[in-house]
C-alpha cells in the first residue's frame, strides 16, 4: 500500500491530516501491518489534551499492546467511537475508517516538523 502524499507522519508511525483548523490522527499502514490483527483500541475522551511524543491511547493486537503517541500538542474535539465495535478497521482502512482522534492543535507549525510521505517511506525501509 502506498503512503498517502497529503499526510504528515511521526517517527512513532502516526499520521496527521490537516482539515482546516483541525487535524485528524491515526496510525499508518506500516504500523498496523507490523502489529497484526487489531482486536481492541483504547482512545482518550473529547476535551482531553494531548502532548507531543506522549501516549494518548493504545491498540491491542493478537501479538502485543502498543501505545499511540501524539504527534502534536492539542485538545481532542472528536474520537472515532466506531473503533470500539470495529477495531479491525485499523487493519482494513488505516487512512479512512480507522482515524483515531481529531485535534485542535495548540500550534499548527508543529505539523511542519513531521515527516513527508517520502521521508516516512525512507524511514520505514530501514526498519
Curated annotation (Swiss-Prot):
Endoplasmic reticulum among keywords: no
UniProt entry keywords in alphabetical sequence: Lipoyl
Any GO CC annotation of this UniProt entry: cytosol
Biological process per Gene Ontology, one example term: glycine decarboxylation via glycine cleavage system
Domain Lipoyl-binding positions: 22-104
Modified-residue entries (N6-lipoyllysine), positions: 63
CDD domains, alphabetized: GCS_H (cd06848)
Coiled coil: none
Cofactor note: Binds 1 lipoyl cofactor covalently.
Required cofactor(s): (R)-lipoate
Pfam families the UniProt entry points to: GCV_H
Entries under HAMAP family matching the protein: GcvH (MF_00272)
Self-association state and partner proteins as the record states: The glycine cleavage system is composed of four proteins: P, T, L and H.
Family per similarity comment: Belongs to the GcvH family.
Function, as annotated: The glycine cleavage system catalyzes the degradation of glycine. The H protein shuttles the methylamine group of glycine from the P protein to the T protein. Is also involved in protein lipoylation via its role as an octanoyl/lipoyl carrier protein intermediate.
Descriptive protein name: Glycine cleavage system H protein
Organism in which the protein naturally occurs: Bacillus pumilus (strain SAFR-032)
Source lineage: Bacteria, Bacillati, Bacillota, Bacilli, Bacillales
Gene that this polypeptide is encoded by: gcvH
Amino acid at each position: 500500500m502506498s503512503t498517502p502524499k497529503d499526510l504528515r507522519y511521526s517517527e512513532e508511525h502516526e499520521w496527521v491530516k490537516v482539515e482546516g483548523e483541525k487535524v485528524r490522527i491515526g496510525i499508518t499502514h506500516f504500523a498496523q501491518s507490523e502489529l497484526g490483527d487489531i482486536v481492541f483500541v483504547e482512545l482518550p475522551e473529547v476535551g482531553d489534551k494531548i502532548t507531543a511524543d506522549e501516549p494518548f491511547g493504545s491498540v491491542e493486537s493478537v501479538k502485543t499492546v502498543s501505545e499511540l503517541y501524539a504527534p502534536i500538542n492539542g485538545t481532542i474535539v472528536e474520537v472515532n467511537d466506531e473503533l470500539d465495535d470495529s477495531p479491525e478497521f485499523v487493519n482494513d482502512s488505516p487512512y479512512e475508517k480507522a482515524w483515531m482522534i481529531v485535534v485542535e492543535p495548540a500550534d499548527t507549525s508543529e505539523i511542519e516538523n513531521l515527516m513527508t510521505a517520502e521521508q516516512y517511506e525512507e524511514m520505514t525501509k530501514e526498519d
